[in-house]
Regions:
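N-terminal helix-turn-helix DNA-binding module of bacterial transcription factors
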Residues: 1-61, 324-327
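Short, well-structured alpha-helical segments in soluble
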Residues: 104-114, 221-232
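Residue-level detector of anion-binding/catalytic polar loops
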Residues: 16, 48, 88-93, 139, ...
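Periplasmic-binding protein-like
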Residues: 115-122, 179-182, 211, 231-241, ...
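Alpha-helical recognition/docking segments in bacterial nutrient-uptake
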Residues: 1, 59, 63-168, 172
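Flexible loop/turn connectors
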Residues: 230-327
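Hinge/beta->alpha junction and helix N-cap segments in small-molecule ligand-binding domains
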Residues: 51, 69-78, 96-105, 155-165, ...
């Protein structure tokens, strides 16, 4: 007996092929009566939608789409690890993708019908563009994105509080000539961290300089090498993430600069590598952030009740040997 097709389901349910497609993909413009009739016909015929096996009664995939700005690096490895762990507890799978600049936001629409909900981390996207690209019928939770309308639940890292904590620490150590290695100019996290650094340095009447980086280790190393070449004097460096702080640490050690005696260094995130090099940093609890995002989205999917609260994931200062002088 040949496999059932979508046309067979349409004939059995006495609806159009388009109605079957909309019903099984969970779109809004289908009555509940039609949705149930289509699901029953699909079950009787043993029809499996092309996007893969799914719970036909509710057109559920038990999969969550996770869209990140990148999949490279320890931050993203950690956040995905937390998401995968929490999704597994609830019997869900993850479908991962990235927002490549050359492809725009097309990946968001491409996941419709393949997942029950989306988690989107797009700190570089304009709010209007992101709001327009999110599929209307697909529940979505946003992580560290610019504020958008539409009532989507969101989780934000408390960047300002984290930066204030590390600045209080550095200034409390007597450091007065401060450097901040900033992240990409179009990244909301980088912007918030740079602005918090500027405000804290100005409030304490410290000399400071903000230099450009791109969140990579190489950019942190290059930034510090350039500062030393230009003869800029500094006694503390705060990297907008751990990778750049670690790059800065490598540049200083290569130049024979003593850390933390001559220059103190701190980062942001607390990736696993930060512990190995004993880097003072702002701990985000990255895996826990991923777990919380999944738990909140799946909780809404299961209860069918979504709230639009913007939740703040508060970081904490972790002091290690790159700022702590041994007594």
């Amino acid at each position: 007996m040949p496999d059932a097709t979508i046309r067979d389901v349409a004939r059995r349910a006495n609806v159009s092929v388009a109605s079957v497609s909309r019903a099984l993909n969970g779109l809004e413009n289908v009555s509940e009566k039609t949705r149930k009739r289509v699901a029953e016909a699909a079950r009787e015929l043993g029809y499996v939608p092309h996007a893969g096996a799914r719970s036909l009664s509710l057109a559920r995939t038990h999969a969550v789409g996770v869209v990140l700005p990148d999949l490279h690096g320890e931050f993203f490895s950690e956040i995905v690890r937390g998401m995968d762990r929490e999704a597994g507890r609830h019997g869900y799978l993850l479908l991962l993708s990235t927002l490549h600049p050359e492809h725009g936001t097309t990946v968001l629409g491409a996941l419709r019908g393949r997942v029950d909900g989306l988690i989107v981390m797009a700190p570089h996207l304009d709010a209007v563009d992101l709001a327009a690209a999110l599929p209307r019928a697909l529940p979505a939770l946003l992580i560290n994105t610019r504020g958008i309308s539409g009532g989507h639940p969101a989780i934000h890292i408390g960047n300002a509080a984290g930066v204030q904590a590390v600045m209080d620490h550095l200034i409390g150590l007597g450091r007065r000539r401060l450097v901040h290695i900033a992240g990409p100019a179009d990244n909301i996290d980088a912007q918030e961290r740079a602005e918090a650094f500027r405000k804290a340095a100005q409030a304490a009447n410290c000399e400071f300089e903000i230099v450009a980086g791109d969140f990579s280790e190489e950019s942190g190393e290059a930034a510090v090498t350039d500062l030393m070449t230009r003869g800029v004097m500094f006694d503390a460096i705060f990297g907008a993430n751990d990778n750049m702080a670690i790059g800065a640490l490598q540049a200083l050690r290569a130049a024979g600069v003593r850390v933390p005696d001559d220059v103190a260094i701190a980062g942001f995130d607390d990736i696993p590598l930060a512990r190995h090099v004993s880097l003072t940093t702002v701990r985000v609890r990255i895996a826990e952030l991923g777990e919380r995002a999944i738990a909140r989205l799946i909780g809404g999917l299961e209860s069918k009740e979504f709230d639009d609260r913007e939740e703040t994931h508060e970081p904490e200062l972790i002091v290690r040997s790159t700022t702590r002088l041994e007594s």
